Amino acid sequence: MKTYSAKPADIEKKWVVIDATGLVVGRLATVIAMRLRGKHRATFTPHVDTGDNVVVINAEKVVLTGRKRDQKVYYHHTGFPGGIKERTAKFILDGRFPERVIEKAVERMLARGPLGRKVLGNLRVYKGPTHPHEAQQPTVLDVAALNSKNVRI
């Protein structure tokens, strides 16, 4: 029997919505990355985008364990000499775009190639409880119920 290889035309992409309220960032990001990549399916094929479209709501209510909220530092460089900049997770979560913490965590769990960039385009993160994807009829994925360690209250 030959190994099954999924073709792009055979894949049915589902829409999944995840409520990030009280969820631990790293544990949430692993579930999202697995869903985006399609590794939860029996028809997973390494060179094809077999994953789902994932919508994350309430990104501002996500939790970092330990003292990471104060101690975790995100770096970026301006491109100029000595232009290294840093921001703490607390600064980002309390700022205008708290969804970037989840986006960055998932981005760093995916491959850094053409397929990884394509798969990351299937992720939509919103800081509030509403999202504009109701027409796609997304199914709710309860990440808190998967493992008791996924949620902190």
Curated annotation (Swiss-Prot):
Keywords: Ribonucleoprotein, Ribosomal protein. SUPFAM superfamilies: Ribosomal protein L13. It comes from the Bacteria. GO terms for biological process: negative regulation of translation; translation. GO terms for cellular component: cytosolic large ribosomal subunit. InterPro entries: Ribosomal_uL13, Ribosomal_uL13_bac-type, Ribosomal_uL13_sf. One of its GO terms (molecular function) is structural constituent of ribosome. It holds the Pfam family Ribosomal_L13. Belongs to the universal ribosomal protein uL13 family. This protein is one of the early assembly proteins of the 50S ribosomal subunit, although it is not seen to bind rRNA by itself. It is important during the early stages of 50S assembly. Part of the 50S ribosomal subunit. This is Large ribosomal subunit protein uL13. The lineage of its organism: Bacteria, Pseudomonadati, Pseudomonadota, Alphaproteobacteria, Hyphomicrobiales.
